[in-house]
């Protein structure tokens, strides 16, 4: 199984949207059983919060399922657990 983690500052906008879009693409290709996809934050600011309403609205507008999600912070263990950890911008990469 390929394990992918998307990371942004708060885990309520970009990384969450990317997680849901990528999951939708994987599911559409019939590859759901080959991937584990998640997202996380570099900061603690939004821990426990749901996706931002703007993110949810845009996903629904595009017909992409909004999955159950609460913001989490990435950990050192994630480097061992995931095959790919993808930061959403240069600042995120520095903070990872």
In which residue ranges do the predicted regions lie?
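Alpha-helix capping/helix-boundary segments
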Residues: 92-93
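Helix-loop-beta element that forms the nucleotide-linked donor phosphate-binding surface
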Residues: 96
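Conserved active-site segments centered on acidic
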Residues: 1-81
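Glycine-rich, N-terminal phosphate-binding loop of Rossmann-like dinucleotide-binding domains
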Residues: 89
């Amino acid at each position: 199984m390929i394990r992918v983690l998307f990371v942004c500052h708060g885990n309520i906008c970009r990384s969450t949207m990317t997680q849901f879009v990528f999951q939708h693409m994987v599911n559409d290709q019939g590859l759901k059983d080959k991937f584990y996809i998640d997202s996380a934050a570099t900061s603690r600011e939004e821990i426990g919060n749901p996706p931002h309403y703007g993110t949810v609205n845009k996903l629904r507008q595009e017909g992409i399922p909004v999955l159950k999600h609460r913001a989490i912070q990435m950990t050192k263990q994630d480097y061992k657990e995931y095959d790919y950890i993808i930061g959403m911008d240069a600042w995120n990469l520095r903070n990872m």
